[in-house]
Amino acid sequence: MAEETQVLVKFVTKLPAHLRVPETPVAVPSDLKRYGLSQIINHLLALDPPRPFDFLIDGELVRKSLEQHLLAHNLSAESTLEVEYVPAVVPPQQKNSTPHDDWVSSVDGSRCAPASSSGGSPSGVVVSGSYDGLLRLWNGDLEAVASVSAHAGGVNCVRFLPKSQGDLLLTSGKDRLVKMWQLSSSEEEDAGPSCRLVATYRGHEDGVEAVAASPSGRRFASCGWDGKLLVWEGGEQLRWAAGTAEASKKKRKTGTANGSAAAGAGGADLRGHLHCVSSVAWPAENSLFSGGWDHSVRRWDVSSGAAADTYNGSKAVLCIASHAASPALVAFGCSDRALRLWDTRGKAGSDALAVTTQGAHGGWVTAVAWCPSSQHHIASASHDGTIKMWDIRTQIPLGMLSHHTDKVLALGWLGGAEAGHARGLVSGGADCQLRMYESDYIVS
């Protein structure tokens, strides 16, 4: 019988002190994979119940045995491996779903804290937009709170501004408009929040596909089928201006919601895309990303209005996402079913050096969302009806959700960066369903 090969391993972590094991090297079987290593950490920490852990060697997630990792990286079995352990991300389970009258085109769950992180009962609000033109508000159990006719022809995008700007929400639609809304609490004890139109932004000549606020929330960008990428002034100061106008009786004409509305002030027109600009992300105050049907992803210097970097691919870019902690990195989904990552610190435009293919779906990748509390985790959604969770340090998905019965069109995380955690997802699609997923172990 062959003698069992062992490897010296030193376990390290950035977790709090009560989750740290001694860094003294220990000998472990070389055929151990993630599960076996997780058992060792749980044993050393005497955790009850046990917790799942993931492991990294030189920044790469371990998905093979230690022996296979040594061979793949041409490392000696005599050397001591430094292995970092982190909490494993466990795919969530569907908690609730609720029907819409039409396709669900966009969702935002950043103002909703799931039950697992709020003492047993969900709190906050989830917003959704759909092809019937309605903006809907839901509580943490996906019970209807309010709805308002927001856009003629359908809502394309719904996005909260950062909390520093108060309870302000942006929507865009097929009617060429962008609108800003104020969420306010009802005076009735059992009633939920309501929506009031604050401002209407006109400047696009075709449907507005997406909006994204700057980190401060004082500006936002919009993009659409007219090939335009526009930067606007917005935020709390505009809400205040609208309120002042109402108080002084100098009202502008409003649309379909009650209350007075200001006319949004336009800013820069960032020119460069040759076709529909499908998506926009704004990770740093002076730097934003856009993606379009001209197969390109562009990083813009907002101050100069010029494209700082451009990646030219071979297929239409349908969605993009970024993270404030890694503003040089952008994830984007394409019509060739691939999810890609572009590190703009690499050689711009070089597929070999700057862009990596994270993974693939069975259909167009229509939505991607970066976890607000982790720069390593993203989720993607596709026309194949699935949602996949990824750690960008490996090309193997962490898990897949397949509850939708038709194309998934919208995706977001529950809880924002301000909450310091994200323990769930919310999604919508062509099956006219809004779905919520929760887990005890996602990212915190």
Curated annotation (Swiss-Prot):
Annotated keywords: Nucleus, Repeat, Ribosome biogenesis, rRNA processing, WD repeat
One annotated Gene Ontology cellular component of this protein: preribosome, large subunit precursor
GO BP, sorted A to Z: maturation of 5.8S rRNA from tricistronic rRNA transcript (SSU-rRNA, 5.8S rRNA, LSU-rRNA); maturation of LSU-rRNA from tricistronic rRNA transcript (SSU-rRNA, 5.8S rRNA, LSU-rRNA)
Entry similarity comment: Belongs to the WD repeat WDR12/YTM1 family.
CDD domains in the record: WD40
WD repeats: 105-148, 150-191, 203-242, 272-310, 312-352, 360-400, 403-444
Alphabetized GO MF terms: ribonucleoprotein complex binding
Compartment list: Nucleus, Nucleolus; Nucleus, Nucleoplasm
Function as written in the Swiss-Prot or TrEMBL entry: Required for maturation of ribosomal RNAs and formation of the large ribosomal subunit.
UniProt-annotated stretches for the region Ubiquitin-like (UBL) domain: 7-87
UniProt organism field: Chlamydomonas reinhardtii
Sequence segments annotated as region (Disordered): 91-123, 243-264
Name of this chain's protein: Ribosome biogenesis protein WDR12 homolog
Highest taxon of source: Eukaryota
